[in-house]
Design a protein with these regions (language model features):
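Phosphate/dinucleotide-binding and metal-coordinating scaffold of catalytic cores
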Residues: 1-504
Length: 504
């Protein structure tokens, strides 16, 4: 797998990549499975390869059941800790991140960074109830890097609006009726944001999202806000999505020389769309002002310096030339950030647009999904590329012998080829919806759609899969928590807005 990664320039993963393993710690042996992890080759260089590890049974290690180990430099050594400690001041969810000494098959690898994965244990460690954790599917984004000319990404697949929604811990979710309902709710909300049906503040928790964006700007982390690095927790109490911090890589942060390192959010399309929301922008601004006050008291910078000193001493035992971060830059950074008004931010954000996309050997050109729980279904096609496409045919295929058993019969007649307009780069996707009724013995078949770029002979085959629909209407009344509390005078909200407390 590692050799394959060096051939194509990135590491691709599959569930079948896991191999059995045993973890020994303090005279205990724990059964596990593990695989290589990471996207870029920096995770595979030298002897300190990155691994994703899942412990079996009820076993945990450092309170975690799923985690990764990697060379500390892939996360900027202790920079991740400085980032997380800052976010904790704003009650933004963070994974555990520690340093451990690792032996692999008897070979001393030295110090490795251990990073918690996205499970209910992460939520419980952040004093949150178990809930759904979502992300955008990034598989086509990485496939486009393999297929792209000169190993470059294809701009067509760097669009969060066309990506499918993915979920962590999928088996456990579908086995739980409560979690399944939460999944439908959370996915419907996030799809509503993707398609601009709902405002960002209706989908995301304004306070935690605004604070997250402010801290990312404060630390200069552009990496944590890339759409494919975003992770969202569906809070079943507030029924909103909250960001989970991940992979800040502040060692690669933009500096503030001539202001070029500021407003990293506005170089990410999704963050421009989120910051346009007045409620989230208000919380973003409030968090920046809080950071300024924290810095003016000097205790916060001293706190970060004490953390840095502790970890530089530890890491310096192996990495002798490791330097600290320029924490004195932070006061200058926060002052410059506060100089920008909301109008300035929106104006600057409009300047960042993707480059051109030429016709290439795309990894895919459409997404096709099936929604609906009854006998009547909706087959939806989404154009992923900035070129018009034709759907040549839709067929019912026998699952056992892959032969066509009967023609696809929509509720309204179709005339092939079906036309699907181009999707503008970073724009809302071009779609086509077809209603149809399930045929007799529908469990014995699968749908197969064949499509092509107009003027191109290459045929792309696509098997539609079941998906959760976008909410057509708001799933709950848009009321502020203060308005709701007026209906229940015996309750009050905790200062951190995370608990309801009975008044005495």
């Amino acid at each position: 797998k590692r050799k394959e990664a060096f051939k194509v320039g990135i590491l691709t993963q599959q569930a079948s990549d896991y191999v059995p393993a045993k973890i020994r710690f303090q005279n205990n042996t724990i059964k596990a499975k593990m695989r290589l992890k990471g996207d870029w080759l920096d995770h595979l260089i030298g002897e300190k390869w990155s691994f994703r590890i899942h412990l079996k049974g009820e076993n945990t290690l450092f309170g975690m059941k799923k985690f990764s180990i990697q060379h500390p430099k892939t996360r900027g050594f202790h920079g991740e800790i400085l980032f997380f400690e800052t976010l904790k001041k704003f009650n933004v969810l963070t994974p555990r991140y520690i340093f451990v000494n690792v032996d692999l098959n008897g070979e001393d690898l030295g110090i490795m960074a251990l990073e918690e994965s996205f499970t209910k244990l992460l939520l419980e460690n952040n004093k949150q109830r178990e809930g759904i954790i979502l992300k955008f599917d990034e598989s086509l984004y990485w496939e486009s890097q393999i297929n792209g000319k000169k190993g470059e990404f294809m701009p067509a697949f760097d669009n969060y609006k066309t990506q499918r929604i993915d979920i962590f811990n999928i088996k456990k979710t579908y086995n739980s009726p409560i979690m399944s309902k939460q999944l439908a709710f959370a996915t419907g909300l996030l799809r509503g944001f993707q398609n601009k049906r709902f405002s960002p503040s209706h989908v995301f928790d304004s306070k935690t999202m605004g604070s997250f964006l402010a801290v990312c700007e404060f630390c200069g982390s552009w990496h944590a806000i890339r759409w494919h690095n975003l992770r969202f927790y569906f809070n079943p109490f507030t029924q909103k999505l909250e960001p989970i911090a991940f992979d800040a890589s502040i060692y690669d942060r933009n500096n503030i020389i001539d202001g070029h390192g500021l407003l990293t959010n506005l170089k990410q399309e999704i963050m421009v769309d989120i910051l346009k929301d007045p409620q989230i922008y208000k919380e973003y601004r409030t968090a920046l002002l809080k950071l300024k006050k924290m810095i003016e008291k000097e205790e916060f910078i001293e706190y970060l310096m004490s953390i840095e000193k502790k970890y530089l001493t530890m890491l310096g035992m192996e990495f002798f030339l490791l330097w600290g971060y320029d924490l004195e830059e932070l006061p200058v950074r926060i002052d410059k950030l506060l100089e920008y008004s909301r109008k300035d931010i929106l104006r600057i954000g409009e300047k960042f647009r993707p480059g051109n996309q030429i016709k290439e050997d795309f990894p895919a050109i459409i997404h096709s999904t099936i929604t609906g729980s009854g006998p009547d279904k909706i087959l939806e096609f989404v154009n992923l590329v900035p070129f018009p496409i034709e759907i040549q045919s839709i067929q019912l295929i026998d699952k056992t012998n892959n032969k066509t058993i009967q023609p696809f019969k929509p509720l309204r007649s179709l005339s092939y080829p079906l036309y699907l307009e181009a999707t503008e780069l970073s724009g809302l996707p071009s779609k086509l919806s077809i209603r149809y009724a399930l045929p007799v013995k529908h469990d014995e078949y699968r749908l197969l759609a064949k499509s092509s770029l107009i003027g191109n002979t290459k045929i792309y085959e696509n098997v539609p899969s079941q998906y959760i629909p976008i909410f057509e209407n708001t799933p709950y009344p848009i009321l502020k928590i203060e308005q709701l509390l007026k209906q229940f005078p015996f309750l009050k909200l905790s200062p951190d807005h995370r608990e309801l407390i009975l008044k005495k």
